[in-house]
Amino acid sequence: YRGLAREAIRSATDPQSPDFLNFHEGGQPLVDCGFLAQALLRAPSELWHKLEGQTQRNLAAALISSRVISPPFNNWLMFAATVETALAIAGERWDAMRIDYAIRQHQQWYLGDGVYGDGPRFHWDYYNSFVMQPMLLDVLRNIGAHSANWEKLLPDTMARAKRYAAIEERLISPEGTFPAVGRSITYRCGAFHLLAQMALLGELPAPLTAAGVRSALTAVMRRMLEAPGTFDPNGWLAIGYCGHQPHLGESYISTGSLYLCSTVLLPLGLPPANAFWSGATQDWTARRMWRGEDGAADHAI
């Protein structure tokens, strides 16, 4: 799979390839570049250092070309910041202003109790997990040391992420469902991007356990991905939340978009001996609570 990923990057960034992707026309390519850049931050050894020199140059040029896209005043700022962070880690010329602007705005948009506004206002959706908090963490963890003003933000950013991860775990019902609220719910279990990331980083908030989170996320994946109609006859994901529900699609949703659900698989980066994989199956918060078990009260931060 690692080899296939590198081959995909080679084909997608080679201007002479029939598979060359659009990195700068329209607005949506900035989103695609942001997630590609985030992959580079998470697996630089496999997805950057093992690329051939020409592919590295093509990839850098492709990411740089996305700078012509002006991001809206919302979560999209993190796509631009993530692209610049990946360029910095790759040893390319990078734009510190794009990173600083995104970080500063998200500090201003923090609303309390682990939640950021998607822009100045609160939106009841999962974009704190789809985009904002995972990218903010990855940017600060990778590039924060370049600026004391950035580095000092990481502890609070991590504390907020832990709180949001705790809320996410509580949203998972005993049956493995979660509220279908807000836009982009066709990203399915990608709604738990942040919870999966915190498991990968070993930063799950107390009293959550790694095995309990694994059990909860497994229940969600089974409930969503085993639903009839989830995949089309060719094996590709179909637009929907639980099955094929095309009216849930939006103008920016394509077949490729749906694979944001794969972020729930981030703990695959943990070794088999890690407690996330080796621990016995455990009930998660809602399952324990609805069974009548006693437990600690939940509190804001």
Residue ranges and their predicted role:
Residues R6-M158, R170-H193, G202:
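Aromatic-lined, polymer-binding surfaces characteristic
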Residues E25, D118, I239, S278-G279:
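Generic structural "secondary-structure junction" signal
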Residues I99-A102, G202-P205, S278-R288:
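Short secondary-structure transition/capping segments
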Residues F122-I239, P246-A273:
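Long, repeat-rich segments with strong aromatic
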Residues A191, H244, W284-R288:
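Short amphipathic alpha-helical patches
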Residues L266-I301:
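Extended hydrophobic packing segments that form well-structured cores
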